[in-house]
Every structure is written in structure tokens, then in C-alpha cells.
């Protein structure tokens, strides 16, 4: 009987949280709030968890399904970027990526050292630039505090998204007068079936191949393989409602596990978190100078290329400002590098600790 009441209570809470999240998501999207759907889900599910004093669990199979679509979405920039375009920028981009990763890892370790409540895995994942929607999933897989990682990542995303239009407006650039549109991709029904199958089995393939962060890299690998075998004109982008569901799922996992104790802990660590976010943004801005010199591009392009996240805002400003392919190439290389490294963070931390001792 108690089990029935508990399940009935959970169904009622979800019947309020799910439509409430969708409504707030549309409102945030209309207001152009960064990461609108994820933040909407965090707000609504977090309010439910805080008001009832109980976590709001999400069905494990449904969450695994959503994680598969995160991997699919992460792979799409690789399919839309030509290999020749990437190869020209690969070495400078890798150099910039190494510096960016070093800042993120160093900042995360310092944050963990300064705030004993934060583990080293949590600190590093909260400071890695790029893939804000992916980091909470990786944090959950790696046993880090995914609530803190999510809140920190979206604090960074918000700071970058708000500052980018204001800062890049100060840099000289040539606005694009004539928009160049790529050939429209078609999406037959069987392409959608392939995407759904990849989302369902991708994490199992990743585990079978023993990939780090298998729930993300497994679907990514399958999407890239399928994309190489099938003509470019076919789109593997999930439909908009599926994207909304995927982003909402990330927010529900974070917000549904919030508590007053967790929020108080995050608030207590907020000054340190903000400081390291500012250092990360400033460090990435500094790496734009050598990139500008080596590739002979404008600082406007280099700054967008090295921006620590907010990819959609970066690409919109890049298109509006007439930036070259260096922006897309560098951002894609950095995201792939971050994903490849993130799964090895526990082993990397153990290696650093061994050398230190």
C-alpha cells in the first residue's frame, strides 16, 4: 500500500513538473535565455524537490535514452564540417585546446584544494570549457557531484553567452552582407529510425568497446561511422521535440536531486566558482592572440574560436560577423578533445597524485 502511495505521489509530481518545464522552456526560448530548456527543467524540478523535501527520480531507461541523444547531438558538428576544413586548422587548434584544457584542469584542481567539500573530479568537470550539456552526464557516470557540475557549467555558459555579444561588438570585423546557406539536408524516415537505434544502443556499444564516457562517446562513434557511409545530404539531427526532451532530461536529473543543503553548499562556494570562471574566460581570451598571429585571422575570429562554450551563440555571432571556418574548426576540435579527455579524468588525477607523492 505504501509503495502504491509513493508511486501515485511520484506520478502526480511528474504530471506537474513535465508540462511546467515545457511551458517555462518555451518562455525562456522566447526570451533567448541561454540553455533555455535545461534551465527551465532545473527550475521546475528543483522547485518540486525543494518544496516537497524529496528527490524527483527519473526513470533509468528513459534517462539512458536521453543520454544517447546527447551523444548524437555532440557528433553532428563533425558531420557538417569538411575534413579538409579541419585539417588546415588542426595543429593550431590542438595547441589552443591544450592550453584551454590545462586552465580548466588546473582551475578545477585548485578549486577542489580551496574547497574541501568539492572532489577533484567534481572540480575538474565543473571547470572544463565546452560541452556544458554533456558534463553533468559524465559527472554522473564518473561518480562526481553532478549537481555542482551542472550549476557551475551553466553559470559559465550564462557568463559567456551574455558577455560574447557585448565584447565581440568592440572588435573590428566585416559583417556578412550575403548569407551563404548550405544545401538543405533531407531527413527520410529511415534516418530517424537510425538515430533512435543509435540513442538506444550507443552506450552499450561504448561499454563493449571500453570507451571512456561510453554513454556519450558510444553514440558519437556510431553517428560518425553512419555519417561516413551515408551521403552528406541526409540529416541525422534529432527532431526539435526530441532535442527539447533531451535537454529537459539533463535539467530534471540535476534539479530533481536538489536540496537546501546542496544549494547552501553551492552558495558557500559561489565566490570561488565565479573567480575560476572569470579566470577561465580570461585565459581563453589570451590564447586568441597567438591563434590570430599564426592563422592570420582577425581577433574577432580568434576570440570566437577560443570562446569557452556557448557554441550556439558563437556560431550565430560568427555567421553575423562574417567569420571564417576557423571558428567552427577550432570549436569542433576542442569539444572532441574535451569529450575524449573527460572520461579519463579519474585516471589522470591518480597519475598526478602519484607523481606528487
How should these model regions be labeled?
Residues 1-19, 120, 145-148, 173-189, ...:
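Intrinsically disordered, low-complexity non-transmembrane regions of multi-pass membrane transporters
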Residues 2-62, 69-82, 187-262, 282-286, ...:
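Structural signature of multi-pass alpha-helical membrane transport proteins
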Residues 54-57, 76-89, 105-119, 233, ...:
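Transmembrane alpha-helix boundary signature
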Residues 59-71, 90-95, 117-128, 150-155, ...:
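Cytoplasmic-side transmembrane-helix entry/capping segments in multi-pass membrane proteins
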Residues 80-89, 170-186, 231-240, 262-264, ...:
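Membrane-interface helix termini and inter-helical loops of multi-pass transporters
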Residues 99-100, 129-135, 150-169, 283, ...:
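Membrane-embedded alpha-helical segments of transport systems
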Residues 108-118, 160-178, 204, 209, ...:
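Juxtamembrane and boundary regions of transmembrane helices in multi-pass small-molecule transporters
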Residues 111-155, 297-332:
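Alpha-helical membrane segments and immediately flanking helix-loop junctions
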